[in-house]
Each structure stands twice: as C-alpha cells, then as structure tokens.
UniProtKB/Swiss-Prot annotation:
GO terms for biological process: mitochondrial translation. The keyword Ligase does not apply. The lineage of its organism: Eukaryota, Metazoa, Chordata, Craniata, Vertebrata. Pfam families: Tim44. SMART domains: Tim44 (SM00978). It comes from Mus musculus. Component of the mitochondrial ribosome large subunit (39S) which comprises a 16S rRNA and about 50 distinct proteins. Component of the mitochondrial large ribosomal subunit (mt-LSU). Within the mitochondrial ribosomes, required to direct the nascent polypeptide toward the tunnel exit and position the exit at a distance from the membrane surface. Keywords: Mitochondrion, Ribonucleoprotein, Ribosomal protein, Transit peptide. The gene is Mrpl45. Belongs to the mitochondrion-specific ribosomal protein mL45 family. One of its GO terms (cellular component) is mitochondrion. InterPro entries: mtLSU_mL45, NTF2-like_dom_sf, Tim44-like_dom. One of its GO terms (molecular function) is structural constituent of ribosome. This is Large ribosomal subunit protein mL45.
Length: 306
C-alpha cells in the first residue's frame, strides 16, 4: 500500500523531471596552463667558511701556512735613460789647437778641474763592474761605434739593438727605410779618450746607470742613396775628418748588461752639415693627343725669322 505524498513535494518532483528532460548546454571555459621552459642550472651560492679575511689568516697561521702579501704593483723594466745626465761641454776649437799652445794648456787645465766628479763616478761604476778601466774602455767604445754604424749598411737591426740603446736606435734608423747607406771607417786621427764619466740613479738611488763620454777623432766616408740609386748625401770615395763626442751607457744593476751607444753630443760651435741633395721633376710641355714630344722640340729649335 503506497504512502500518500504531500502536494507540494509532488509538484517539485514534476518540475525537476521536466528540467531533467531538457538538453544540457555545455559552455567552453578558457583554461591557462603554465608551461615551464628548460631552465639553466644555477649552482647554489657557496657560503664562505670564513666570514672575514682575518679569520682566514688566523686559521692559516695555525695550520702553518705562509700566505704571501698581495702587492698591487706592476714591474717596469727601464733598460736605458731618456737622455744624458750631465752633458759634457766640449771646449771651443777642440782638435784645432796644439796642446803646447796657450789655449791648449788652458783647455787641459779646465779638464783636470772637472775630472774630480768623473773620478767619483768611476769609483761608483767599479762597485758594479770591477773590470771597468778608463785606459781600456776607449778602444772597446770605438769597436762598438764602428760595428753599430756598419749595421746600417746591411740594415741589421737585430744586431744594432744589442749595440745601441732604445733611446739611440730611432735616431740612427730614422728616415732610412727606402735608402741605401754606405758608411766606412778609414782611420783614427787621434787615440780615443774618456773625457766625461757620470753615474746617477733613476726612480731611486738603488737603480744606477753609468754614462761615459768618449772623444773620437776619426776619418770616415759616408754616402746615402735614395731608392732609385741617386746620390743624396756625401761621397763614398771622399773621406772626411770627423770629431765626435759619443756617450755610452750601461744599466749597472743588471749583471748581464753591457755598454751600448746612447747619444752624441754636438757642440754649438760645430760647422753646419752638408745639405741633402734633392731631385725635383720639371714638368714638360703640355701636348695635344695628336702631337709628339720630338716634333714640338724640333719646332722650338727652329730659328725665328725677323
């Protein structure tokens, strides 16, 4: 026997049954899905075992480790100086006066007075170079002078670097790239002699450099040709007497250093040098396309009638 159903509930059931028979509308919803790309592996940041440098030094000291002190310095190698310390002043009229004349004796007296500073410098140089002697050095300096100038004939710059300093090298090879040099040594008119010696420090007093000025009175030949073989300066078959004061330098602190040619002292009373011969191109006459140079030259040589 069925139980009675209340009126309100029966109407509710009928209503729900009607909605259940209706078609269901499905709506499309937008869904955002995050896609991860391949990320680069980043290792974790290591944590320092010692927070401060002081703790690290204390631990190293206990472990018996010696940590050298870090110096923010960069080594600089100075192979030569940039000039002459105390330039020698050649006496006026040198090599022209006799040593027995009054002027010659005066020059020798002044040279002896200035010799005191040179003696102190010689003692300083001998502390680093025990074999340095003023009697033997002039011949050695003359050999260096001759060999350095002969390197210009063959353009042997590698050998020239060992004979001259970095200060003297540009002065010797300047403007000789496309030229031919013919230099020759004939003879010595007077024995080479040391006239000036100086010793000084660069940057500090422990970095010592020695400079020796040698007087060379020689006879030489010199000729310079351009790249086309035309003579620009001098003559190969005409020797000339040359008086030069050459400065030689050495880095005394370098145990493997050697004496090299550093500079030349040119006195104010020295005669002027021979000018360089310059060749110029003289432009010819302007010709028309149908004219020839021989025809115009022949026309120019025709006599003009009055």
């Amino acid at each position: 026997m069925a139980a009675p159903v209340p009126r309100g509930l029966s109407s509710l059931y009928r209503t729900l049954g009607w909605w259940s028979r209706q078609p269901i509308l499905v709506t499309q919803s937008t869904t955002v899905v995050q896609v991860k790309t391949k990320s680069r592996f980043r290792p974790p940041t290591p944590e320092p075992k010692y927070k401060t440098e002081k703790e690290f030094l204390e631990y190293a000291r206990k472990a018996g480790l010696v940590i050298p002190q870090e110096r923010l310095e960069r080594p600089i190698h100075l192979a030569c100086t940039a000039g002459i310390f105390d330039p020698y002043v050649p006496p006026e009229g040198d090599a022209r006066m006799s040593s027995l004349s009054k002027e010659g004796l005066t020059q020798r007296t002044e040279r002896l007075r200035k010799n005191a500073a040179s003696q102190l410098a010689i003692r300083k140089i001998r502390e680093f170079d025990a074999n340095f002697k003023t009697k033997d050095f002039p011949e050695k300096a003359k050999d260096i002078f001759i060999e350095a100038h002969l390197c210009l004939n063959n353009s042997d710059h590698d050998r020239l670097h060992t004979l001259v300093t970095e200060h003297c090298f540009p002065d010797m090879v300047w403007d000789l790239k496309y030229k031919t040099v013919r230099w020759g040594f004939v003879e010595s008119l007077e024995p080479a002699q040391v006239v000036h010696v100086r010793c000084s420090g660069l940057v500090n007093q422990s970095n010592m450099y020695g400079q020796v000025t040698v007087r060379l009175h020689t006879r030489q030949t010199l000729a310079i040709y351009d790249r086309f073989g035309r003579l620009m300066y001098g003559q190969e078959d005409v020797p000339k007497d040359v008086l030069e004061y050459v400065v030689f330098e050495r880095h005394l602190m370098n145990p493997y250093g050697s004496w090299r040619m550093h500079a030349k002292i040119v006195p104010a009373w020295a005669p002027p040098k021979q000018p360089i011969l310059k060749t110029l191109m003289i432009p010819g006459p302007q010709l028309k396309p149908w004219e020839e140079y021989e025809e115009t030259q022949g026309e120019a040589q025709k006599p003009q009638l009055a």
